[in-house]
Design a protein with these regions (language model features):
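Bacterial N-terminal signal peptides that target proteins for export
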Residues: 1-8
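Hydrophobic helical h-region of N-terminal Sec-dependent signal peptides
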Residues: 8-15
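C-terminal motif of bacterial Sec signal peptides marking the signal peptidase cleavage site
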Residues: 17-20
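Predominantly soluble domains enriched in secretory-pathway, periplasmic, or organellar proteins
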Residues: 22-458
C-alpha cells in the first residue's frame, strides 16, 4: 500500500515509542536535549486507588515545562474521576489503569508528535473505556464492553485501550476473568463529534493451543503505522498479530500470526512502534522474578503475510515494564527499559541488540521506587512510581519505602545513563486517603497507587 510505504520511509527519520503495559502505551523521542524543545505538552498520570468506596481514582495533569524543570514544585491539576464520570452520565470507573493519547492531526513525519485531541482511559476493574477531551478535561464518551458485542464475551478487566494512528478506531485489550481467556474489543471513533460506537468483539480462547498456553489473555497492543495491524502481547507469553479490519466492524478482526511462548517467552507487557516498520515489546518475569526479555519485530512484511521471528534480547534485573526509545547524538537508536521489581533501568543498543548499561533508580530519597509505565520526550523520561500497596500486578510486594508519583529522569546524550535528584520527583501522595498497612494493619499509609502515564502533545 502506497500510504504504508510512505509512512515507513518517513518513520526512519524519527522515533516513536510507547511504553507500556499493564502498561502499553505509545511514547516518543527525538534527539533534542530536553522536553521543552517540542511543542506545548503535558504529562498525564492516573492514581488507580478509589476515591469513592471501591470506585473512582485521580487523574493528575502537569504542565510539561513545569514538571521537567522542577517536578517536586510543579503543581498538577487533579481530577476526581468518579465526579467527572458522574458529570458525564458515565458509570463510576474502577481502577483507572492506562491513559493513551489519540492521533487526530497527523504529522506526516511523526504522528505521535501531532496534536492529540483526546486521551483514552482504560479502567481495569469496571470494563469501561473513557474518552477525555484534552482541552476541557471532561469525559466526553464512555463505552462499557462487559459481555462483549452481541454477547460475544467480555469482563470488567479492560486493561488497555489504544487509538489507531488514523483516528478511526480504538482496540481494547480485555484480559478476561482469572483462569479464563480474554477478548479484543473494537470501538469506532469520531473525535470531532464525540461519537464512540462499540462494534466488535474477538474472543481469543481459540488461539490458546497455538500460543502454547492454557488460556489466551491479552495485555497490551499497538498498531502498525498504517493502522492495518495490531501487535498484541499476552499474559502467558506469546504474541498475536491481528489484522484489525474495518472501523465499523463489517470487516472483522482476524489473527494472521501467532508467535508461541517458545518464541516469545515472558509475561507480555508494553508495545511500541519504532522507525522502519519495527515493533518493540517486552516479556517480563513479574512479581516473582525470573527471566526478562526485550523483543523487536519486523512488521514490514505483515501486509504480505511475512512474519519473521523477533530479535530477542535478555535483560538483567527483574520485571521489565516501561520501555521507551531514545536517539543519541549520532542518530543511533536505543531502548530504555525500567525493571519494576529490581528498580533498575537498562539501556539497550538497538544496532547491536546488546544491553550496554544498567543503572539503579533506588536512592536515598526513593528507596524502593518500583518504576512502571513510562514515556519520553526529548531526553526527559517520565515514569510512574507505584504505591505502597499496589492494586494490580505486584500486589504481593508491599513496602513502606515507596514514593508514589512521577519520576523525571534526564537521559544522557548518548542514551546510556540518566540523572535524577529529589527535585525530579512529583509526588502523588494523597494524605486524605489511607489504607491499613503492616502485618497487623494497625497503622495506615497513603492509598495512592500510580500506574498509567502519558506525555500528551497539545
Amino acid at each position: 500500500m502506497n500510504v504504508r510505504l510512505l509512512f515507513g520511509l518517513m518513520l526512519m527519520l524519527v522515533l516513536i515509542t510507547a511504553v507500556a503495559c499493564e502498561d502499553s502505551k505509545s511514547a516518543s523521542s527525538t534527539g533534542s536535549s530536553g522536553a521543552s524543545s517540542s511543542s506545548s505538552f503535558e504529562v498525564w498520570a492516573v492514581d488507580q486507588s478509589p476515591t469513592s468506596a471501591e470506585h473512582g481514582g485521580l487523574l493528575y495533569i502537569w504542565d510539561g515545562d513545569d514538571i521537567s524543570e522542577n517536578a517536586s514544585q510543579a503543581t498538577p491539576e487533579i481530577i476526581d474521576l468518579a465526579v467527572a464520570a458522574s458529570n458525564a452520565n458515565c458509570p463510576a470507573p474502577k481502577k483507572p489503569h492506562m491513559v493513551l493519547a489519540n492521533h487526530t492531526s497527523n504529522n506526516p513525519l511523526d504522528f505521535r508528535f501531532s496534536r492529540a485531541s483526546h486521551v483514552v482511559l482504560a479502567n481495569v476493574g469496571s470494563g469501561d473505556t473513557f474518552f477525555i477531551n484534552i482541552d476541557s478535561r471532561s469525559i466526553v464518551g464512555c463505552v462499557n464492553t462487559l459481555g462483549g458485542f452481541n454477547g460475544a464475551g467480555g469482563t470488567a478487566n479492560t486493561h488497555a485501550a489504544t487509538a489507531s494512528p488514523d483516528s478511526s478506531m480504538v482496540i481494547v485489550a480485555n484480559i478476561g476473568a482469572k483462569g479464563e481467556s480474554g477478548f479484543l474489543h473494537k470501538i469506532q471513533t469520531d473525535y470531532t463529534n464525540d461519537d464512540y460506537t462499540f462494534v466488535e468483539t474477538l474472543p481469543l480462547d481459540q488461539f490458546s493451543n497455538a500460543l502454547g498456553t492454557s488460556v489466551a489473555r491479552p495485555i497490551c497492543h499497538d498498531f502498525t503505522a498504517d493502522s492495518e495491524f495490531a501487535y498484541v502481547t499476552m499474559a502467558g507469553g506469546g504474541l498475536l498479530v491481528v489484522d484489525v479490519g474495518s472501523d465499523d466492524g463489517t470487516t472483522p478482526m482476524t489473527v494472521v500470526k501467532v508467535y508461541d511462548t517458545e518464541t516469545v517467552p515472558g509475561i507480555g507487557c508494553g508495545v511500541a512502534r519504532l522507525p522502519n516498520d519495527k515493533i518493540m515489546t517486552n516479556g517480563e518475569s513479574g512479581a516473582k522474578g525470573g527471566d526478562d526479555f526485550l523483543y523487536t519485530f519486523d512488521a514490514s512484511g505483515a501486509e504480505d503475510g511475512e512474519f519473521e521471528n523477533p530479535v530477542k534480547i535478555e535483560l538483567p534485573g527483574e520485571d521489565t515494564h516501561g520501555a521507551v526509545a531514545c536517539t543519541d547524538q549520532d542518530g543511533n537508536l536505543f531502548a530504555i527499559t525500567s525493571m519494576r521489581v529490581s528498580n533498575d533501568v537498562n539501556f539497550v543498543d538497538l544496532q547491536t541488540n546488546k544491553v550496554v548499561a544498567t543503572q539503579s533508580m533506588a536512592t536515598n530519597f526513593s528507596l524502593d521506587p518500583k518504576p512502571d509505565v513510562a514515556d519520553i520526550l526529548g531526553k526527559k523520561m517520565f515514569i510512574a512510581l507505584r504505591g505502597h500497596k499496589p492494586l494490580t500486578a505486584i500486589g504481593s510486594l508491599e513496602s513502606a519505602d515507596r514514593t508514589p508519583g512521577v519520576a523525571v529522569l534526564t537521559i544522557s546524550d548518548d542514551c546510556k545513563s540518566f540523572n535524577w535528584e529529589a527535585k525530579d520527583l512529583a509526588s502523588m501522595t494523597d494524605s486524605g486517603r489511607t489504607v491499613p498497612f503492616g502485618l497487623t494493619g494497625g497503622s495506615v499509609i497513603t492509598a495512592a497507587d500510580p500506574h498509567g502515564l502519558e506525555v500528551v502533545i497539545k
